[in-house]
Design a protein with these regions (language model features):
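Active-site lining segments that contact anionic ligands and/or coordinate catalytic metals
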Residues: 290-292, 339, 347, 365-368, ...
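C-terminal tail/sorting-segment detector
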Residues: 501, 505, 511, 515, ...
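Short, glycine-anchored, charge-dense loop/turn motifs used at functional sites
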Residues: 488-495, 522
Length: 541
């Protein structure tokens, strides 16, 4: 059989035993979970940074003297004679962006996103007993299962399991639009499940549309031989895959990118990730109902020539490409009006060791930093700053559950807050009860949400009595309901209940006393039923 595109139709082929004479489309195949956003237009973009991103030279503790001491050649220095090569402070914190994330980037890059409330920085992400093999650690991150035991085979991703659970009739009923879409390569384990692949991978969209799918030009075979049966069966599978070609082609032709945002540059300084994000933006603009997109950027295995004393090198170039891609996408999404429907998350299999090596590079390490972007993220820094006094026997930053963030908490937050799942749903998908890190707000309120779209996602904090220790939380409910407001610190640890009561419809202002809490960023989470809204509080003493 001739295969004429880069389409990976594994969602179909993986379900070989059950695919005969089955319908392709379904009006509403969701049944197993009560995930509110899965059945609306909420979208997740995951950017995989393969190679192990150096978090310490991405979000930088410049004011810690030990940082420069252990990285004399590759550190980013505040006194660089070239102002464009100096680190850029994040809000009023003591952490800094690498200048490549800001300077020379579309609309000031990550600084512009942070100032606009569209970027969350999540420090110290990782897992206990880290595995420093690229492939095993990548499998751990993509599977959502924390196991470094090589005997434990990891064959499916947390996204694949999420959709497997949400689409109980799959593969007997196939959604009209692909659930997941990967740009380039063969389909990632992230999008695979026990029921088969829950998405497809394509290369260049123009070629994908031009080539027209995967089915053969040859007719069905006659006869009842085993060969004929298998041939005709495989051909029918590919023909069903062609239906996805048609909906992608329609979205591609209907969609657009905002004039003046040049996603077309596929090489050079901006690189292929920019092109991938432009493709995703255009498909969303054109009405494709895919729920999860996966983009990729490699090259982060920076053992040599990571960066020189002038901040030139492989790592700054990659960070510049990442910042351009995300910033251009968000600009396009805002201008086209779909920004409130989309969040994005970066993932990288591990970080780098604090000490530079002898080749102006760094070796495999443990924890790193991840980014979440979108209009529905909590724009702040989550997690504790790196502690150079607490290194393990390999000289890596030690993973401490009291200070670091289990990477699965990022996924649990997506499952529960973005896709509306319950704690039990999250447990089923991640195979463990994982407390979500509250870095997201719910999608724009549905008609069933009793919290009005008031201020910052239905919940707003104001410091009305001119004291850093006190203020008010404001919100409005459109019907009588029970409301709980909880407080979490920047690590996502529960810090106390602020309110727990049944209230009547209308506007409410709840006094908040923060005098017993230390300085820092806190998250207030308002919940009622399955709906959650969050806002941040900054305490300065």
């Amino acid at each position: 059989m001739k295969r004429r595109t880069l389409l990976k139709a594994g969602a179909l082929a993986g379900a070989a035993a059950s695919f005969r004479s089955i319908p392709l489309f379904a009006q509403n195949p969701i049944g197993a979970l009560g995930l509110n956003a899965i059945d609306n237009d909420a979208i997740l973009i995951i950017i995989q940074m393969f190679g192990g991103n150096d978090g310490l030279n991405t979000i930088i503790p410049v004011d810690d003297p030990r940082y420069v001491q252990i990285r004399p050649n590759i550190s980013v220095k505040k006194d660089n004679v070239d102002a464009t090569k100096r680190p850029v402070r994040i809000l009023s914190s003591d952490m800094y962006f690498h200048p490549a994330l800001v300077n020379g980037v579309h609309k000031n890059g990550f600084l512009g996103l942070m100032d606009a409330g569209r970027l969350a920085v999540i420090q110290g992400t990782g897992y206990e007993n880290p595995n420093l093999s690229h492939f095993r650690s990548t499998d751990i991150w993509l599977s959502g299962l924390n196991t470094s035991d090589p005997a434990n085979r990891l064959n499916e991703g947390w996204v694949g399991r999420m959709f497997e659970k949400n689409y109980p009739e799959f593969p007997m009923v196939i959604p009209e639009h692909p659930l997941c879409l990967q740009l380039g390569g063969s389909l990632s384990m992230l999008l695979q499940s026990d029921k088969g692949d829950m998405g497809l991978a394509i290369g260049d969209v123009d070629s994908f549309v031009k080539d027209g799918g995967t089915s053969s030009d040859s007719p069905m075979m006659g006869g009842t031989s085993n060969y004929a049966n298998e041939y005709n069966y495989i051909r029918s599978i590919a023909a069903k895959g062609d239906a996805y070609n048609k909906v992608i082609e329609e979205a591609w032709k209907k969609g657009t990118n905002t004039t003046g945002i040049d996603f077309a540059i596929a090489n050079g300084a901006k690189g292929s990730l920019v092109r991938q994000m432009g493709i995703i933006s255009r498909l969303i603009s054109g009405g494709l109902k895919t729920k999860v997109y996966l983009a990729n950027i490699g090259g982060f295995d920076t053992h040599v020539q990571q960066q020189d004393t002038s901040n030139n090198g492989q790592h700054p170039a990659l960070l510049n490409q990442l910042a351009n891609a995300v910033s251009m996408f968000m600009d396009d999404a805002v201008q086209q009006g779909f920004a409130n429907r989309v969040i994005g998350l970066t993932v990288s299999e591990f970080g780098r060791r604090p000490y530079e090596n002898g080749s102006n590079g760094t070796d495999h390490g443990t924890t790193s930093v991840q980014f979440a972007f979108g209009t529905r993220v909590q724009a702040n820094i989550f997690g504790a700053n790196p502690d150079f006094s607490d290194l393990d026997r390999n000289g890596d930053l030690a993973f401490d559950m009291n200070r670091n963030i289990d990477y699965r908490r990022l996924y649990s937050e997506i499952i529960q807050t973005w896709f509306g799942g319950s704690t039990d749903d999250s447990k089923d998908i991640l195979k463990d009860r994982v407390v979500p890190l509250p870095y997201l707000q719910s999608p724009i309120a549905s008609l069933n949400d009793p919290i009005m779209n008031y201020g910052n996602g239905g919940l707003r904090f104001s410091n009305d009595i001119a004291s850093s220790n006190s203020g008010y939380l404001h919100f409005e409910v459109k019907k009588n309901c029970h409301v709980t407001i909880r407080l979490y610190d920047s690590l996502g640890k529960f810090a106390g209940n602020l309110f727990d009561s049944y209230i009547i419809a209308g506007n409410h202002s709840i006094p908040v006393d923060m005098s017993v809490h230390a300085s820092g960023m806190y998250i207030c989470e308002l919940s009622t039923g399955n709906f959650r809204h969050t806002t941040s509080i900054i305490v300065r003493k």
